[in-house]
Amino acid sequence: MNEPFTHAIPILHTLHEHGYQAYFVGGAVRDVLLGREIGDIDIATDATPDTVESLFEKTVDVGKEHGTVIVLHDGMSYEVTTFRTESEYEDFRRPKEVAFITSLKEDLLRRDLTINAMAMDINGEIIDHVGGKQDIERKRIQTVGDPACRFQEDALRMMRAIRFLSQLGFELAAETAEAMEKDKHLLANISVERKKIEMEKLLKGRYCERAIKVLISTKLYEELPGLEKDRLQDSFQTFPYYLLDGLEEVWGAVIHLLGLDEEKAVLFLKEWKLSTKLLKDAVAISRYVDCEWNAEKMFEAGEHVLLSSLKITQLKHERRIFFDELEAAKSSYDALPIKTLQDLAVSGKDLMAFRQKTSGKWIAEELDLVKKAVLHNHLENRKEAIEEWLTACDQQLEND
């Protein structure tokens, strides 16, 4: 049994010693079978939340009404959830009623996808009532039971299914795909914030191209903000988003590949409810994709935008990242004599004193001239040198 599980075994032991069932469940069990890195460890039990709290010294109530208590053990936190059934879903996303039960099988049958609906006992034996193991072997994504019922319960499960397809490279079961196309309108009941989380994970998946094609074939894209079919060109579908780093790079690539101008890009990202900072960064990165770089452009962009937009340019044209080119760009940026206007040896106040003039738009214009001269190494970034240069410029204008 893998290390993350062995660390949590004392929790199962405690529950067993007091007469309760306890199993590892969910994504961690799936990832064991896939040979992937194990993430969070979740535990399911027939002990009620109150009982779980009484058995462990350190717990956190994160949703007792839905059966979940966090148990803190040896510096780690584990979600311990009581076996339950759910009925009468509201808004196609949350159960109206939750009933605690004593059957592991019934608890597993309420879950979304077969690959997520397996359990593992304390000895490492897999309990699979839904064919999850077989679906992993066949590389297939399908719901537990009737897909229409699962999507009626929580419409976001449609996007989750395609997100797992993107991450794992599996195929979508035919009946699951058919139900998606039929019930796609239910996604209108899901908040943009929840859809955004799934979309970001989908875009970062190794098999994103396959997932985007499924979004199109099932017409799910019609229920997502700002995605119009005529903009979903091959370049958008085939771009390797998973090779990018931050979400600002991912969204920057998206708006560039959708062919949105800056005004439309801002509206598109606002529809997706991006934070102000993430939106601003994504738009800036997109602005400089395919840029012909010089000192002024590097100064305007800044190091992060420079490297991020260059990465997107490389991936767009070559589908790979050239790290030597990125390193060369970083060296060029580091060699700039100034990185911000504040680095200039003169300020607006200095210019006002030197010119003996009051404030006005002339200050910004003159600072811009000085900035360009310094960036192109035509002028040393020293106050005295700048004042001499400005005097020489004045004399030239007079002579002209």
From Swiss-Prot:
A single active site specifically recognizes both ATP and CTP and is responsible for their addition. The keyword Iron does not apply. Pfam families: PolyA_pol (PF01743), PolyA_pol_RNAbd (PF12627), tRNA_NucTran2_2 (PF13735). This is CCA-adding enzyme. ATP binds at G27, R30, R111, D154, R157, R160, R163. Mg(2+) binds at D40, D42. GO terms for biological process: RNA repair; tRNA 3'-terminal CCA addition. Keywords: ATP-binding, Magnesium, Metal-binding, Nucleotide-binding, Nucleotidyltransferase, RNA repair, RNA-binding, Transferase, tRNA processing. It comes from the Bacteria. It is an enzyme of class 2 (transferase). Its EC number is 2.7.7.72. It catalyses: a tRNA precursor + 2 CTP + ATP = a tRNA with a 3' CCA end + 3 diphosphate; a tRNA with a 3' CCA end + 2 CTP + ATP = a tRNA with a 3' CCACCA end + 3 diphosphate. GO terms for molecular function: ATP binding; CCA tRNA nucleotidyltransferase activity; magnesium ion binding; tRNA binding. HAMAP family: CCA_bact_type3 (MF_01263). Its cofactor is Mg(2+). Belongs to the tRNA nucleotidyltransferase/poly(A) polymerase family. Bacterial CCA-adding enzyme type 3 subfamily.
